[in-house]
Amino acid sequence: MTDKKYIIALDQGTTSSRAVLLDHNANVVEIAQREFTQIYPRAGWVEHNPMEIWATQSSTLNEVVAKAGITSDEIAAIGITNQRETTIVWEKSTGTPVYNAIVWQCRRTADITDKLKADGHEEYIRNTTGLVVDPYFSGTKVKWILDNVEGAREKAERGELLFGTVDTWLVWKLTQGRVHVTDYTNASRTMLFNIHTKQWDDKMLEILNIPRSILPEVRNSSEIYGQTNIGGKGGVRIPVAGIAGDQQAALYGHLCVHAGQAKNTYGTGCFMLLHTGNKAITSKNGLLTTIACNAKGEPEYALEGSVFIAGASIQWLRDELKTVHDSFDSEYFAQKVTDSNGVYVVPAFTGLGAPYWDPYARGAIFGLSRGANCNHIVRATLQSIAYQTRDVLEAMQSDSGERLQYLRVDGGATNNNFLMQFQADILDVNVERPVVKEVTALGAAYLAGLATGFWKDLDELRDKARVERTFSPDSDNEKRERRYKGWKKAVKRSLEWAKEDEE
């Protein structure tokens, strides 16, 4: 216990940067949020400006302190959680990025991953890194930058460049270039990290021709990495004391810290993690084996299913189809009809993630009849999020041999009661929605707070956790299985759609 009153979690996401101020009871006191530009240079390419990421994130940090009317000497620590895999390479001496951040959604390196498969590296990558060979992960993005940005490879070989995922970039900027680190959870998403030895893997660096000198030091998710000054009275220096990739942070924020506990985060993408304790389970069903947070001692493991498009499909309804005015309208319009009228939406806008891993899949609407209307499409789009979650759960249960008893949920789309009820129905398990919705930020705050003595231990945190609503499934198993069978048929027809165009 300390005399400090607050923890700040920096939640650097795919579409916005947020700062969340929490008190000792793990209640959200204040939030500041700023969106930033999404850059689409070509079909399937997605970039961010690293300087804009930093500008929005640093401004929200200052803003949340100002909005709350507090001073920096009341803040115990800062925890960071971030969009994972997104790749930044910058000059060590100037801090200037050599290229835009290549975002996790970006598919530009599909040709590199195809070559990795053709060269027979799939099994080694799966066994060593826990990952499948896919453009999603950082390794091929780093290679692309070094191969395609003029002079980058030569600078990297001379030790003049640094690589980092977004957490590394933020810590570098917060500490004014003094600290170049990542944590185990983010390192495990690069395709460059051996999750068993917990070291950067020399063979992967050789395969992708990436110099070791650009890599950050890998540290635990809960420790003091450095300090930052955000002004205020006396300009007190505040410890940066927690780092976790967004999905692992959410798992920790739900206090899913034991084998068999699972959560699903409904953000831009949809991410389900099942904690597997100290056992790294190699999936036979297209899931990832990844590292989970542990505030004390060695990091542990989880199985993860990554769905690329979840909340982004609701944005698509709003921005491109213009069938809803804002994301909150989707629940209203989905309930204007009693069913989806046989319509299925497969939102494979950037390919399909787990358990299919097909970068050439594309989005499609199936089952349209003359009676289908916009409300059916809205309803089917929401249902697609729940169907994709079931795809992942089926794979998890097969790999782990365990039947899930409940699913803890977080993310913006969990405010949609229609979606949460349909999720419970299609999974046939209880879905638990917590009182504090900012679970990803909560996880980062917990990690930073435990590292600095703001909270004593997990037992203290468990006493603060509360469920706001439990959604229980309906008992109609025949309807559940009929609907899911239709989804599987729709997905099958979406696979490899773009492959011929790119050959």
From Swiss-Prot:
GO molecular function ontology, one term from the record: ATP binding
Keyword terms, alphabetized: ATP-binding, Glycerol metabolism, Kinase, Nucleotide-binding, Transferase
Gene Ontology biological-process annotations: glycerol catabolic process; glycerol metabolic process; glycerol-3-phosphate metabolic process
InterPro entries: ATPase_NBD, Carb_kinase_FGGY, Carb_kinase_FGGY_CS, FGGY_C, FGGY_N, Glycerol_kin
UniProt-listed Enzyme Commission number(s): 2.7.1.30
Residues that coordinate or bind ATP: 14-16, 268, 311, 315, 412
UniProt keyword tRNA-binding, yes or no: no
Binding-site residues, sn-glycerol 3-phosphate: 14, 84-85, 136, 246
GO terms under cellular component: cytosol
Record's catalysed reaction(s): glycerol + ATP = sn-glycerol 3-phosphate + ADP + H(+)
Family: Belongs to the FGGY kinase family.
Known function: Key enzyme in the regulation of glycerol uptake and metabolism. Catalyzes the phosphorylation of glycerol to yield sn-glycerol 3-phosphate.
Name of the featured protein: Glycerol kinase
Organism: Haemophilus influenzae (strain 86-028NP)
